Amino acid sequence: MAPQMGYDRAITVFSPDGRLFQVEYAREAVKRGTTAVGIKAADGVVLLVDKRITSRLVEAESIEKIFQIDDHIGAATSGLVADARALVDRARVEAQVNRVSYDELIGVEVISKKICDHKQTYTQYGGVRPYGTALLIAGVDDKRPRLFETDPSGALLEYKATAIGAGRNAVVEVFEADYKEDMNIEAAILLGMDALYKAAEGKFDAGTLEVGVVSLQDKKFRKLEPEEVGNYVQQILEKHKETENKE
């Protein structure tokens, strides 16, 4: 039996070198998930997901990876779909409880911390397992866009631009080179799609992409219609076609 086997099976026991293996395995589930992207712009915040449909028999509309949490908050998920759905439902309840209790919209950071607190409890009690999903939570409060990432351990980080899922490294590489804090929502969408294009090695189209935005102007979350997504995708495809022709 391998030396780490006992620590491998127990969620509540640290290994001698300070690791919780089940939490690490939950992170691996996220790394194998679809690529989700979040970008803060000067006038809002953007979420994009490549739904990575594996069969032409699947109805693309039945796969949802971007969700509305409240009027001004959206979330993108990667990892185990059922786990993500449970966390999204919990976040929606928290948002409604805050609205009823205090007669005001919940803060983006507040809802992110509540979800992280819940995820953290599933790393320290027996008889449960960590959530095998990560969330990008995006919204607008205090007259500025916010973007947070929650991981299976319950850790919380705020980003200007980031990604989760299988294509994370490729996407972050693009962001580090091309992200600008003063870009608008349209430019952020194009940057996100360009990063997803490179992460997917050009294997994407409007039918596999989901895009959500929260504008600083109206503080409303909305998902782009397929026609809008298609227009952005066409711009990206034309851009890369021109680049290939020049080469």
Swiss-Prot record:
GO terms for biological process: proteasomal protein catabolic process; ubiquitin-dependent protein catabolic process. InterPro entries: Ntn_hydrolases_N, Proteasome_alpha, Proteasome_alpha-type, Proteasome_asu_arc, Proteasome_asu_N, Proteasome_sua/b. Transmembrane segments: none annotated. This is Proteasome subunit alpha. It comes from the Archaea. Keywords: Cytoplasm, Proteasome. Component of the proteasome core, a large protease complex with broad specificity involved in protein degradation. GO terms for cellular component: cytoplasm; proteasome core complex, alpha-subunit complex. Its main location: cytoplasm. One of its GO terms (molecular function) is threonine-type endopeptidase activity. The formation of the proteasomal ATPase PAN-20S proteasome complex, via the docking of the C-termini of PAN into the intersubunit pockets in the alpha-rings, triggers opening of the gate for substrate entry. Interconversion between the open-gate and close-gate conformations leads to a dynamic regulation of the 20S proteasome proteolysis activity. SMART domains: Proteasome_A_N. The 20S proteasome core is composed of 14 alpha and 14 beta subunits that assemble into four stacked heptameric rings, resulting in a barrel-shaped structure. The two inner rings, each composed of seven catalytic beta subunits, are sandwiched by two outer rings, each composed of seven alpha subunits. The catalytic chamber with the active sites is on the inside of the barrel. Has a gated structure, the ends of the cylinder being occluded by the N-termini of the alpha-subunits. Is capped at one or both ends by the proteasome regulatory ATPase, PAN. The lineage of its organism: Archaea, Methanobacteriati, Methanobacteriota, Stenosarchaea group, Methanomicrobia. It is found in: Cytoplasm. Pfam families: Proteasome (PF00227), Proteasome_A_N (PF10584). The keyword Cytoplasm applies. Belongs to the peptidase T1A family.
